[in-house]
Regions:
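Conserved acidic/glycine
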Residues: 1-76, 270, 278-368
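Mixed-charge, polar/low-complexity N-terminal
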Residues: 25-26, 31, 38-39, 43, ...
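Cofactor-binding active-site loop characterized by glycine-rich and histidine/acidic residues
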Residues: 52-56, 60-192, 210-216, 221, ...
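Alpha-helix initiation/capping motif
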Residues: 85, 106, 116, 219, ...
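A general secondary-structure junction signal
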Residues: 94, 264-266, 348
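Short acidic, gly/pro-rich beta-turn/loop elements at beta-sheet edges
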Residues: 100-102, 208, 272, 343
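Glycine-rich ThDP/TPP pyrophosphate-binding loop and its adjacent helix/strand module
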Residues: 138-335
Length: 368
């Protein structure tokens, strides 16, 4: 088990003494490929800026519906995705933008989906919570808490039947561990020895309820033990630690054909969604979460600078490149057409039926 210190702002009962005071430890960087390290940093920064632009567009009413951001969870997202092959499958909850990009989706099409435009990854019908792409094997994006778990187990069962060495990763938030589908899915996954890694991104608050107040066992990685599923915990702010832990469990699932559980301590910088003011957190907790010492992007950048991998000039170059790519994604979304109303009911049914949208609004059935 890779146990770590909990961020102070994460829980009403969290103690500052459990936190690691310094986040600039470079002990694990010396043996890493410098180009690979810079790539991790670049990907983390891109998610940060992409989500910031998403938040801005939402407040400008360019994006509608629900919207949940990965701000503060960039190291977790990038670390997890670094453990997967292109042929591995991914299921996530509604906080899925960063995962979609990391799994290989074009950021332009992800942004277009957020805008509800025709060129989006789900043709503008899914929006923020429902990123989906069979080519990259990112199969959602699910708006129902815990809804992705049984489906992920089904994909793992299909993998077993096909006798490939692919693995399914199923990401969720801490609140999902109290949903019935959690217990049912972990039970069947172990009974049938499915090649799946369950990942709980523990940001300590399920909407407005802390883990300490909702879970009798707040050490969530231990909750797999009821089903004899081995679990680990990792500091979700440490991209290398997340990558290593995820890689270890993914490869074990691949080789041993059995499920594993990974809990990643993380912290979202915003409320549950863009419109959530997070009044259930004290100002001290908010300030602590946003402090540089707990910011995963700043932490990793400082580590690379201290290790002479990333210069200040290099930081500026990466920042400029990322800014340009995010702007391109936003421009693409702005200029993408809206879906035609005639396609409203396309793909609603498994078997072809007349497109009912063509009856609107002139059809007498809609008349007063």
């Amino acid at each position: 088990m890779a146990d770590t210190a909990k961020p102070k702002g994460g829980s009403a009962k969290a103690s500052g003494s459990r936190r690691r005071n310094s986040r600039k430890d470079t002990s694990g960087i010396a043996n890493e490929n410098p180009d690979a390290l810079l790539d991790l940093y670049r990907r983390m920064l891109f998610i940060r800026r992409f989500e910031e632009r998403t938040s801005q567009a939402y407040t400008q009413a360019r994006i509608g519906g629900y919207c949940h951001l990965n701000l503060g969870e960039e190291a977790t997202v990038v670390g997890l995705m670094s453990a997967l092959r292109e042929t591995d499958y991914l299921y996530t909850n509604y906080r899925d933008h960063g995962y979609a990009i990391e799994k290989g989706m074009d950021p332009k099409r992800v942004m277009a989906e957020l805008y509800g435009r025709k060129d989006g990854v789900a043709k503008g019908w899914g929006g923020s919570m429902h990123m989906y792409d069979t080519e990259t094997r990112m199969l959602g994006g699910y708006g129902i808490v815990g809804g992705q778990l049984p489906l992920a187990a089904g994909a793992a069962l299909a993998v077993s039947y096909r006798e490939t060495d692919d693995v399914v990763m199923c990401q969720m938030g801490d609140g999902t561990t109290n949903i019935g589908a959690w217990h049912e899915t972990l039970n069947i996954a172990k009974l049938w020895n499915l090649p799946i890694v369950f990942v709980v991104v523990n940001n300590f608050t399920g909407m407005g309820t802390t883990v300490d107040m909702s879970s009798a066992e707040p050490d969530l990685y231990k909750r797999g033990s009821a089903f004899r599923i081995e679990g680990e915990r990792v500091d979700g702010r440490d991209v290398l630690a997340v990558r290593d832990a995820a890689t270890r469990l993914v490869e074990r699932a691949r080789e041993e054909q059995t499920p594993f559980l990974l809990e990643a301590w993380s912290y979202r910088m915003k409320g549950h969604s863009v419109v959530d003011p997070a009044k259930y957190r004290t100002q001290e907790q908010k300030d602590e979460a946003r402090a540089k010492e707990n910011d995963p992007v700043a932490i990793f950048g400082d580590q690379l600078t201290k290790a002479d991998v990333l210069s200040e000039e290099g930081r500026e170059e990466i920042a400029a490149s990322v800014k340009e790519r995010v702007a391109e994604a936003a421009d693409f979304a702005e200029n993408s057409p809206h879906p035609d109303v005639s396609t409203l009911f396309d793909y609603t049914y498994a078997t072809p039926v007349p497109n009912e949208s063509r009856r609107m609004p002139a059809d007498p059935v809609f008349a007063d």
